[in-house]
Amino acid sequence: MNRLFVVNKPIFRTSNGYMGYVKRKYNTKKVGFSGTLDPFATGCLIVATGQYTKLFQYLNKTPKSYKATLWLGANSPSLDIEKVDSIREVAPFSQKTIEEVLQSFKGELTYYPPRFSAKKVNGKRAYELAREGKEIDLKQITSTIYEITLINYNHPFIHFEATVSEGTYIRSLGALIADRLRVDATLSSLHRIHEGQFHYENEKALDPFTHLAIPSNIYTGDEAYLELGKKLSVDYFEAKENGIYLIETSNFFSIIEIVGEAVKYRFNRIPKFEDTP
């Protein structure tokens, strides 16, 4: 079965662990997902089965939008509610101050990922090293905060919405907001609203052809060459410039790359979408 869809990940389930439920529900063995959500987070998680699992890197998955709640006065080494180790009372802020602080993060943001994250350090996940109490040398990353808006401030909880580039850690954004306010704080809730074009629609099957972030090209040669995976000539493509392209045939679609005079297959003979239950 080849299927692309969005699940609404429940709270306190790992993204990887939730795939076990998806496998059983759809009676399939090959399942993958894109854009890991933390266990405490909920919301949009892109899932694919069968050959569609090869397509994640080509999907239109950015920008991403989140709703989050920042709990002022709470401290957690994981920057979320899973490891809260202290709670202190802090004085309320004016709504104007909160809004100004949030707006100050719009644009490019360079920061360190959370210690409890899936980032790899010398072949191991950062969260594995953090749990072992080991020192972690994480490199800074740069994200773009396209929009950040205050939804509600009900002390000690700041509810905000952020639209960000792919790979942004909202837990780190929450920690930076807390630093700017000069208080301890941690995220108490996080919900992903959408990833690019993808949002939750009761696990509706999606046509991957309309969700790929690569340009289409037209192959004017014999389709049998594509079907058999034979060597292709750049002369038979409408666009001949270097790049990665989507090629549609009557029965399937392929992803190819043109490099100079060479044509390379990225993925070939990917079954077309069939709108079946």
UniProtKB/Swiss-Prot annotation:
InterPro entries reported for this sequence: PsdUridine_synth_cat_dom_sf, PsdUridine_synth_N, tRNA_psdUridine_synth_TruB
Pfam families reported for this sequence: TruB_N (PF01509)
Signal peptide limits: none
Annotated EC: 5.4.99.25
Record key words, sorted: Isomerase, tRNA processing
Catalytic activity annotation: uridine(55) in tRNA = pseudouridine(55) in tRNA
Protein's UniProt keywords contain GTP-binding: no
Active-site feature positions: D38
GO BP: any one term: mRNA pseudouridine synthesis
GO MF term list: RNA binding; tRNA pseudouridine(55) synthase activity
Keyword tRNA processing belongs to the record: yes
Functional description taken from the UniProt entry: Responsible for synthesis of pseudouridine from uracil-55 in the psi GC loop of transfer RNAs.
Stated family: Belongs to the pseudouridine synthase TruB family. Type 1 subfamily.
HAMAP family given in the database record: TruB_bact
Alphabetized PANTHER family for the sequence: PSEUDOURIDYLATE SYNTHASE TRUB1, TRNA-PSEUDOURIDINE SYNTHASE
Protein name: tRNA pseudouridine synthase B
Organism this protein belongs to: Sulfurovum sp. (strain NBC37-1)
Gene label: truB
